[in-house]
């Protein structure tokens, strides 16, 4: 016996279906469902009088040993990823993504590929959005509280360096030498996120670099505050090629040892992660931005310049002075800071992100920007660029899927690929760690509802513990059981170099977290950056600092008002 209902009735019960559009927060972006795995009338839903009951959508016979039986199912969720906007059930088993598809009881339902049994828990995803956990690849490990702030924004992986509130850590993403690297690997045992640490990349003696890779560093950071000379950079890249790790570069702002072209000659055709490629965060003044046109450069932005607003320029001078230990009474220090802040290149940066020329977004946590705003600022840029540049090719009214896929890739899959961890995290694909973020669409990009780490609920919005219901105010982010006991170490990964992994760094340091090697880095090119692989010719006028793409001037107007901003932070 069939039953008919209106589209609005269906959506209120089971969430949007194919062809429906969802507004993301208070932005001007709309995600349209491309595919729905549901069989209408056979949706799995939990609750009183709902279908997930014994003998109905829950199979009464299967045990957990059946490989199709999930530990957890997120029902009827909208999955937004770099390659899809799907409506599906999402199965999790042993902490990994088992499958997205149709969940239920195959004895009485068609097309079931995720079985709900007595060992299965349910998270209701009706009307919710699920994304992969974000990855921030420019983290100064200055303060361990950064991990919790990042988690509450939807970021589940941190890559960078530092040792606490030292001057070196405040200025450079470096954990220098085996002793510091080992201590940070041990400290990570108490953090609720995935981590990987970068060592110091300045040494003409290869042995001084190699020992850091053996100690567990997943790459090296070459930073101008330690000396970003072409020679130091070339030596670091030699070691990276031998050990399949990444080099992250904060280039030479003062052009002391050479210009942008000299740096590129030292790099040759070797892959490199170019930090804050616009240049306000540091790097060859005024034309570091040109490096984004090279096929071996994987360019990222840090978020202080994203998006370009009426306040951006004024904010930057003090940030540069404090972060890089400069003295306001020394004219040369003031000149150094001023040389990095150019409204013309900052205005071009948003456009280059929108064109897919810049591939990633990161934070530069406490060292020129905010660890909890990577995701928010990414979507603010997407909103501003739609306002100023219109639809991307293939998009149309109530369907911004191409732009959405481009921007979500910037803080999920592309950082994972760049640092050799995409086998484990970075997207919603079978076999990857179930690091998942669940959003109410009205709060998308700014305040997630729940964060899962390796399939365990790690952080969630929840009410007063003495309340009669879980929504008793005050509603706020609270640690869940994924952060307690053995789950703290059992649900997060510490990434290390392959040589450290092969030498059993886990046993050497008595680490209890999952330890996994980075891999597949040195053969990368910009073509591997999902939805963000453009390499047009870039030029910068040395007098006006205007930026040209294939000979055409690009710029944007500073925003006076943004979405995902004050209306979400009244309390």
From Swiss-Prot:
Binding site for substrate: 223
One GO CC annotation: cytoplasm
Record key words, sorted: Cytoplasm, Hydrolase, Metal-binding, Nickel
Cofactor note: Binds 2 nickel ions per subunit.
InterPro entries the UniProt entry points to: Amidohydro-rel, Metal-dep_hydrolase_composite, Metal_Hydrolase, Urease_alpha_N_dom, Urease_alpha_subunit, Urease_AS, Urease_asu, Urease_asu_c
Residues given in the record as Ni(2+) 1 binding sites: 138, 140, 221, 364
E.C. no: 3.5.1.5
Cofactor(s) required for function per UniProt: Ni cation
Alphabetized PROSITE patterns for the sequence: UREASE_1, UREASE_2, UREASE_3
NCBIfam families found in the cross-reference section: PRK13207.1, urease_alph
Protein name (record): Urease subunit alpha
């Amino acid at each position: 016996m069939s039953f008919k209902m209106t589209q609005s009735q269906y959506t209120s019960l089971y969430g949007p279906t194919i062809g429906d559009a969802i507004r993301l927060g208070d932005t001007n972006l709309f995600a349209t469902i491309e595919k729905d795995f549901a069989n209408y009338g056979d949706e799995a839903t939990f609750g009183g009088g709902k279908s997930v009951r014994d003998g109905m959508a829950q199979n009464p016979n299967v045990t957990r040993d059946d490989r199709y039986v999930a530990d957890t199912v997120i029902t009827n969720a909208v999955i937004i990823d770099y390659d899809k906007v799907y409506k599906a059930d999402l199965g999790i088993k042993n902490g990994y993504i088992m499958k997205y598809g149709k969940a239920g009881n195959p004895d009485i339902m068609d097309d079931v590929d995720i079985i709900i049994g007595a060992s299965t828990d349910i998270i209701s995803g009706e009307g919710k959005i699920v994304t992969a956990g974000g990855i921030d690849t420019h983290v100064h490990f200055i303060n361990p509280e950064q991990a919790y702030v990042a988690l509450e924004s939807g970021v589940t992986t941190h890559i960078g360096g530092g040792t606490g509130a030292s001057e070196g850590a405040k200025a450079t993403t470096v954990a220098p030498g085996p002793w510091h690297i080992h201590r940070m690997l041990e400290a990570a045992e108490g953090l609720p996120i995935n981590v990987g640490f970068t060592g110091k990349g300045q040494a003409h003696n290869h042995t001084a670099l190699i020992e850091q890779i053996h100690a567990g560093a997943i790459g090296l950071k070459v930073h101008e505050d330690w000396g970003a000379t072409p020679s130091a950079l070339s030596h670091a890249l030699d070691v990276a090629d031998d050990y399949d790790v990444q080099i992250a570069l904060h280039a030479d702002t003062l052009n002391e040892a050479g210009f942008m072209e000299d740096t590129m000659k030292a790099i040759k055709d070797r892959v490199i992660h170019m930090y804050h490629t616009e240049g306000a965060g540091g790097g060859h003044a005024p034309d570091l931005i040109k490096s984004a046109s090279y096929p071996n450069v994987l360019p990222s932005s840090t978020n202080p310049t994203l998006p370009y607003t009426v306040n951006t320029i004024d904010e930057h001078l003090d940030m540069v002075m404090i972060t890089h230990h400069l003295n306001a009474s020394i004219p040369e220090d003031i000149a150094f800071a001023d040389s990095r802040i150019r409204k013309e290149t900052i205005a071009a940066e948003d456009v280059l992100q929108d064109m897919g020329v810049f591939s990633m977004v990161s934070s530069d946590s406490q060292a020129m920007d905010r660890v909890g705003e990577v995701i928010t600022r990414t979507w603010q840029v997407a909103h501003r660029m739609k306002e100023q540049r219109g639809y991307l090719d293939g998009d149309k009214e109530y369907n911004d899927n191409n732009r959405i896929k481009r921007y979500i890739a910037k803080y999920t899959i592309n950082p994972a690929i760049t640092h050799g961890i995409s086998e484990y995290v970075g997207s919603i694909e079978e076999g990857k760690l179930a690091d998942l973020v669940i959003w109410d669409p009205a709060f998308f990009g700014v305040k997630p509802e729940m964060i899962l780490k390796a399939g365990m609920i790690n952080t969630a919005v929840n009410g007063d513990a003495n309340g009669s219901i879980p929504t008793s105010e005050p509603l706020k982010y609270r640690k869940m059981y994924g952060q307690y006991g053995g789950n703290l170490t059992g649900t997060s990964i510490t990434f290390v170099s392959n040589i450290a992994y092969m030498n059993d760094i886990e046993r050497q340091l008595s680490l209890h977290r999952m330890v996994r090697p980075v891999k597949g880095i040195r053969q990368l090119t910009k073509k591997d950056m999902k939805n963000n692989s453009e390499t047009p010719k870039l030029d910068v006028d040395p007098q006006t600092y205007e930026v040209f793409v294939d000979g055409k001037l690009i710029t944007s107007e500073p925003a006076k008002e943004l979405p995902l901003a004050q209306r979400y932070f009244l309390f």
